């Protein structure tokens, strides 16, 4: 059995694939528009062909897939795309290898305890504080996701991921209430599509004509 493993980061807009032979190793990276493939299985097959791998038996030693949606019983339906992914079906496609399927922010949460100073960029000129407590990862992309890493032992961490983008927002001013006509949840306004909605809301408030595409 080979030490090569497929790793994939599957989002609502793009899906990234690569090959890993060990911690910190990543090669054969390819990026595909999620909407450009009918399913994850098709995207995976395209990737295998693109890197010239398979169908030789044993070329792949396993797969790790991080997907933008809630994972339940080894399967996920992407929150912002039509794809569904089953770890069992992916395993069958790859010859019965082990397949790990996790939420994309859970994968980021697993990384948090291993980040070094060189991996970080302080925001606002504030010096980096010593990271001794819980940590949170937030991702603003096609949607909005978050995960928390909580220390449960000397070197052990528990990762809790959730669909934070579906939390409701509550306006506190008349201006915010006007904006909320364009979206009611965190993800409605703080995401790739949400930026357009925020712009549309403020433009309408200023009497500026804009494309209706930005309002949806």
Predicted regions and their residues:
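Glycine-rich phosphate-binding loop of actin/hexokinase-like ATP-binding domains
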Residues: 131-188
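ATP-dependent carbohydrate kinase catalytic cores
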Residues: 99-129, 211-216
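Gly/Thr-rich phosphate-binding beta-strand-loop-beta motif of the actin/hexokinase/Hsp70
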Residues: 1-26, 137-152, 195-202
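A glycine- and small-aliphatic-rich helix-loop capping segment at beta-alpha/alpha-beta transitions
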Residues: 22-24, 81-84, 115-122, 151-159
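Short beta-strand-loop/turn "lid" adjacent to the catalytic site in phosphate-handling enzymes
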Residues: 53-101, 110-119, 137
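A mobile "lid/hinge" subdomain adjacent to the ATP/sugar-phosphate binding pocket shared
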Residues: 180-216
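Short glycine-rich, Thr/Ser-proximal phosphate-binding strand/loop in the N-terminal lobe
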Residues: 2-46, 58, 159-166
């Amino acid at each position: 059995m080979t030490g090569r493993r497929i790793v994939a980061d599957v989002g609502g807009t793009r899906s990234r694939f690569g090959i890993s032979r060990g911690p910190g190793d990543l090669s054969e990276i390819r990026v595909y528009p999620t909407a450009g493939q009918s399913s994850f299985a098709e995207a995976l097959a395209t990737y295998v062909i693109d890197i010239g791998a398979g169908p030789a038996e044993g070329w792949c030693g396993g797969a790790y897939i991080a997907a933008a949606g809630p994972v339940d019983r080894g399967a996920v339906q992407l929150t912002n795309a039509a794809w569904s992914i089953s770890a069992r079906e992916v395993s069958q496609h790859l010859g019965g290898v082990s397949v790990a399927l996790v939420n994309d922010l859970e994968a980021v949460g697993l990384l948090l305890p291993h980040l070094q100073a060189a991996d970080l960029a302080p925001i606002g000129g504030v010096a980096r504080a010593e990271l001794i407590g819980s940590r949170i990862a937030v991702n603003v992309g096609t949607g909005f996701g978050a995960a928390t890493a909580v220390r449960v032992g000397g070197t052990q961490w528990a990762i809790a991921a959730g669909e934070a983008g579906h939390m409701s927002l509550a306006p506190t001013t008349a201006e915010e209430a006007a904006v909320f006509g364009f979206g009611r949840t965190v993800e409605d306004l703080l995401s790739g599509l949400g930026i357009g909605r925020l712009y549309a809301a403020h433009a309408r408030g200023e009497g500026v004509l804009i494309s209706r595409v930005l309002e949806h």
